[in-house]
Amino acid sequence: MYHVPVLLEESVSGLNIDPDGVYLDLTFGGGGHSREILKRLKDGCLIGFDQDSDALANVPDDSRFIFVNHNFRYLRNFLRYCGYDEADGILADLGVSS
């Protein structure tokens, strides 16, 4: 079941997306935030984290997106593994899903 994020526009606008930047979605889940971030990227990269294997069904087929099926506590390691020293923005939807 797809979850429509609350305050989607406000959350993503707050990142002030650089079309060529590197962004992290630490709570990929249904992919709603990630899809919106990808709409705003040109040549940038988005790395999405989710340790829940159910999230795999929501991974977009997009060369600018990298899915990491692990807890985001490893974000620094995976960021470096993907060839980046730092990110331009991080989104984490830490609310309760109902």
Language-model segments: residues:
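SAM cofactor-binding core of SAM-dependent methyltransferases
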Residues: 10, 19-80, 91-92
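Long, charge-dense, solvent-exposed interaction surfaces that engage phosphate-rich ligands
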Residues: 85-98
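S-adenosyl-L-methionine
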Residues: 1-20
